[in-house]
Each structure stands twice: as structure tokens, then as C-alpha cells.
Amino acid sequence: MTKTKQEIYNKRPTSPHLTIYKPQISSTLSILHRMTGVALFFAVSILAWWFILSKFDSNYIKLANCCCIIKICLILTSFAWFYHLCNGIRHLFWDIGLGFSIKAVNLTGWSVVICSVLFTILLWV
């Protein structure tokens, strides 16, 4: 490149970096929906395997009652389940063309998070 072309190349605008990007509720929930989908795949696979093992040895059930880490994993799995369910219902409304305004997207997004937390609390209390 000639000197002028290099100067022009260096002065061209670049896209904003992730450090200055402010995440929006819709983008955050979209990423969370994908993460919970992957997490549920693994969690349900492990739970199925665990239930099969508990059929032959009851110590696996006792382990779940006494181990805090397993209980925390089960609570997080139930939150992921409820979040994925509530957000899936939200997507069904989008499929029929409802709730596309910015206000509706933000309102339903926060509603999904609040309902997921409430359903998880109701399940475990």
C-alpha cells in the first residue's frame, strides 16, 4: 500500500468494542435462552442416568437429600427449566405476531425472569 492508502486505512471507523456496548434485556435473555437449552440437555441426561442408577441402589436418593451441591444443581436445573418454558411461551406469542414493540419486549422479558424465579421458589419451598 502507498502511504496515502495506509493513512486512509488507519483512519477508517471501526465497530464498537464489547467493552463499550451496553447489553439490552432482549440480547441478554436470548443468550440465556440458548445457555439454558444447552444446560437442560446435559442436566436431563445426567438426571435420567441418576434415576436409572437409583433404581438399583437407593444410596443415590440419599445422596441427593444430604449433599448441598446436588440440591443447588437441582434448583438451578429447575430454574433453567422454568426459564426455558416461560421464554418459549413468549416466543409462541412472537410467532403469532404479538409483543414486538420495545415496551412489550422489555415487559415480557422481565416477566419471564420474574415468573421463572417465582416458579422455582414455589417448587422448592
Curated annotation (Swiss-Prot):
CC cofactor = heme
A GO BP annotation: tricarboxylic acid cycle
| Gene3D superfamilies linked to this entry | Fumarate reductase/succinate dehydrogenase, transmembrane subunit
List the stretches on the Cytoplasmic face of the membrane.
1-29, 90-104
Q: Where does heme bind?
A: 84
Q: Name one GO molecular function term.
A: metal ion binding
The entry assigns this protein to a family as follows: Belongs to the cytochrome b560 family.
Its protein name is Succinate dehydrogenase cytochrome b556 subunit
Q: Could you tell me which species this protein originates from?
A: Rickettsia bellii (strain RML369-C)
